[in-house]
Design a protein with these regions (language model features):
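Family-specific functional microsites
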Residues: 2-181
Length: 181
């Protein structure tokens, strides 16, 4: 088992790279997480500015600082507010999710264990949503995120039905109180 430390947290690399395959059947989310972990595949304005594609290296959401991946996904006041709203929604609308602390490592999918696949799935959807907002030049908001979660759950249910794994799906998704079924 390969482990690294980020801040005060220990990261299990094997679990980190396997996590998207455990928590979702959606290839779009799996692909996104893989690209995020290989930082040059998910680009920030800082990188795009350096190679001459963008006119500015400023944050897409606030325009107040240089946009690198940590700033985009964590430090920007708009991303940070979204994460707080997202956390509150997750805690209010799921059952059996232990209280957890928002941290850079967790929000990037860098984990020391994969105990709660529903939580990791919801955070993966949130990461992908933030990046989609960057691409569309819009700010993330929790109402749209909730809509995306509901749509994703419907898709995951259809995939589970097609693969005769509905029982496994039902163990995870009914814990989501806003489940669309």
């Amino acid at each position: 088992m390969v482990e690294d430390s980020i801040g005060n947290e220990t990261v299990n690399q094997e679990s980190t790279y396997s996590l998207p395959f455990w928590c979702t059947k959606g290839t779009k989310l799996r692909d996104f997480q893989f690209k995020l972990l290989h930082t040059r595949r998910i680009t920030s304005n800082d990188f795009l500015y350096k190679i001459g594609i963008k006119q500015s290296n400023s944050c897409t959401f606030c325009g107040e600082a240089t946009e690198n991946l940590v700033y985009l996904f964590w430090s920007c006041k708009h991303s940070n507010a979204f994460w707080k709203d997202c956390y509150q929604w997750i805690m209010q609308n799921t059952s059996k999710i232990e209280n957890f602390n928002l941290s850079e490592a967790l929000l990037f999918g860098l984990i020391n264990n994969a105990k709660d696949l529903l939580r990791h799935h919801l955070l993966l959807i949130a990461r992908h949503y933030i990046y989609t907002c960057k691409q569309r030049d819009t700010r993330p908001n929790v109402r749209m995120y909730i809509h995306i979660v509901q749509r994703t759950v419907k898709i995951e249910r259809q995939i589970a039905k097609g693969h005769n794994s509905l029982d496994t799906f039902k163990k995870k998704s009914p814990r989501l109180k806003t489940s669309p079924f």
